[in-house]
Amino acid sequence: MREPKNAKVLSRLENVLVTQLDVNNFSSIKKSVEKAISHFGRIDVLLNNAGYSVYSPLESTTEEQIHNIFNTNVFGALEVIKAITPIFRSQHNGMIINVSSIGGKMTFPLGCLYYGTKYAIEGISEALTWEMQSIGVKVKIIEPGFTATEFRVEEGAGKHYAEYDNLKQKLYEDLLPKLKTATPPQKIAEVILQAATDESDELRYPTGDYVVEWMALRSKVDDATFLATHRKQMGL
């Protein structure tokens, strides 16, 4: 994990090794993989869960924000997968679980950067199944909705434009009630455990309140109808 000092509870558990890993630091990725192999002798499952979001008009974001979110949410995940693949290949066994989001299947206002990273994770994960199957490795995607965690959310650090204020207000009016009834992280953890142990070839695991019904609606109607329905629900 990024800050091992925060892992007091985990460190007390049996058969748990906590190492420092920052997905934006390839050296720390390599060292963590090496320590895991040295300690356990093998690695069975990789869970890619690092990420954060930026909610802002694209025009109000900075170049640094754009690069940082893709570095963490996408390129960091790729680096971890690349570092661990030789281990899985030598074992001819393993599993990659990538945490995506409902935002990897549909979007909400002002989240083009975040949802862009999640759509990337969806495509990367599905494409990886082809090559990973050749070395005995399964790939799974977890697709949670709103989750009750201390998830990092940034606003745009660039210039403010009043033309987007109404959209921003409507977004928070729509999202805040959903956040109050967000899915407990324990339920997401249960789905991750299921994905890791059910021995199926299932690729995607949508989970959480609203997610299944939204995805069902998304698959049943054309883009114009879905977007119009969503705009109407948000009063836009």
Swiss-Prot record:
Protein name: Uncharacterized oxidoreductase SPAC977.08
Active site, renumbered: 100 (proton donor), 114 (proton donor), 118 (lowers pka of active site tyr)
Disulfide bonds: none
Stored Pfam families: adh_short (PF00106)
Keywords, sorted A to Z: Cytoplasm, NADP, Nucleus, Oxidoreductase
PANTHER family associated with the record: SHORT CHAIN DEHYDROGENASE (PTHR43976), SHORT-CHAIN DEHYDROGENASE_REDUCTASE FAMILY PROTEIN (PTHR43976:SF16)
Gene Ontology MF annotations: acylglycerone-phosphate reductase (NADP+) activity
Locations listed in the record: Cytoplasm; Nucleus
Organism: Schizosaccharomyces pombe (strain 972 / ATCC 24843) (Fission yeast)
CC terms in the record's Gene Ontology section: cytosol; nucleus
GO biological process: phosphatidic acid biosynthetic process
E.C. code: 1.-.-.-
The family this protein is said to belong to: Belongs to the short-chain dehydrogenases/reductases (SDR) family.
Binding site for NADP(+): 22, 49, 82, 114, 118
